[in-house]
Structures are given as structure tokens and as C-alpha cells.
Amino acid sequence: MVSTAKFPPLGERSANAGLPHLQYRSFPAAEANPALNDATLVVVMMEAVEALEHIEEIAAVEGVDIMPIGTNDLTTDWDIPGQYDDPRVAA
């Protein structure tokens, strides 16, 4: 996911001219990519039991910035949709 979101050398995202981050101006990639990477936030939603089982591995990935819990999908994956008072949700 990080490689898809970030520009070289941190990722593989293709750059194009006129991005809002650069006020729609064209810049050489050597200048633009570091600025674009700094402005790109990688958010990995934790919405499945399998994701929680691997949360430490996912958190260790260089470039992952935020990992919020998607309680709607998670409670559905636990077959308790919308039961936010379940002890597993609080944990």
C-alpha cells in the first residue's frame, strides 16, 4: 500500500504535472517527489479480524502513518454488527 501511495524513491506512484499539492504547476520530479511524499498520508484502515491478527506487522511497515479501526466493518466481521459495547471493540 505504501508503494502505491508514495512517489519514487519511496514508492511506485506515477507523477504527473499539475497536482493540487503543487498548486497545479509543473516541477521536475527531483523537486516534486519529495514534496509530494511529505504531503501524502498513508492511512491503513483496520476493518477485519485478519488485519487485527497482523496489526504489529502492518504497523512496522515503513511509511504507514495512521491505522484507525473501522468498527462498523470489524463488528460485522465478528458477526456482531453494530455492537460497539462488545468487549472486543473496547480492547
Model regions and ranges:
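Expand to "…catalyze enediolate/carbanion chemistry for C-C bond making/breaking, isomerization
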Residues: V2-A91
